[in-house]
Regions:
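Metallo-beta-lactamase
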Residues: 80-130, 134-137
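Conserved small/polar residues in nucleotide/adenosyl-binding loops
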Residues: 158-163
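Active-site metal-binding loops of divalent metal-dependent hydrolases
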Residues: 28-30, 57, 81, 121-124, ...
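Hydrophobic alpha-helical segments, chiefly the membrane-spanning helices
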Residues: 169-175
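Conserved beta-strand hairpin/beta-sheet module of binuclear metal-dependent hydrolase folds
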Residues: 1-42, 128-145
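Active-site metal-binding motif and surrounding structural segment of the metallo-beta-lactamase
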Residues: 32-78
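Short amphipathic alpha-helices and their capping/turn segments at secondary-structure boundaries
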Residues: 148-157
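Hydrophobic packing residues within well-ordered alpha-helices of enzyme cores
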Residues: 35, 65-68, 86, 153, ...
Length: 175
């Protein structure tokens, strides 16, 4: 599994997560041109993307969503409230609302060979989520714009330590 930050920050967010056969974007908050450049740098194009996971509806997370969706007809995943806000926004232009796929926090779903778990986060948006993506034993999580995090989120982000990490935790620390 591979994760690449195409863009991150207040000017726009777009993260690539993928396996050998399934390719996802988390957010599309930069121009379609910049997304294409980022994908090209890792040997992909928009045609390779199997889904876009939207964390919330703020412009720095959806700026390129309309163009990307229209051009490549990529399914868009997000909470019902987030998708309703996106569909109501005139700034995205016309796009196929049939590509909008609602997800529920804490209910896993599959995109290709990747298991995706959305989970609630604290942010001033319409039911925002972060995502944990798993492929076999490997997983990665993307949690943006969090006001704070609690024990529940820590548990979701935690993965079983490797045997090496477990062995290290048994060793006395050097002073």
């Amino acid at each position: 599994m591979r994760m690449v930050s195409i863009a991150s920050g207040s000017s726009g967010n777009c993260i690539y997560i993928g396996s050998d056969s399934t390719h996802l974007l988390v957010d599309a908050g930069i121009s379609n041109k910049r997304i294409q450049q980022g994908l090209n740098e890792i040997g992909l194009t928009g045609n390779d993307v199997n889904g876009i996971l939207i964390t919330h509806e703020h412009s720095d997370h959806i700026k390129g969503l309309g163009v990307l969706s229209r051009k490549y007809e990529i399914p868009i995943y997000g909470t019902r409230e987030t998708l309703d806000e996106i569909a109501a926004a005139g700034s995205l232009g016309k796009f196929d609302k049939g590509l909008l796929t609602p997800v529920c926090p804490d209910l896993d779903f599959m995109v290709g060979d990747l298991t995706v778990k959305p989970f609630k986060i604290d942010h001033d948006a319409a039911n925002p989520v972060a995502y944990r993506v798993q492929n076999g034993e490997k997983s990665v999580a993307v949690a943006t714009d969090m006001g704070h995090f609690d024990q529940y989120i820590i548990c979701l982000l935690y993965t079983s330590p490797s045997p090496r990490d477990t062995e290290r935790s048994r060793m006395p620390s050097s002073a």
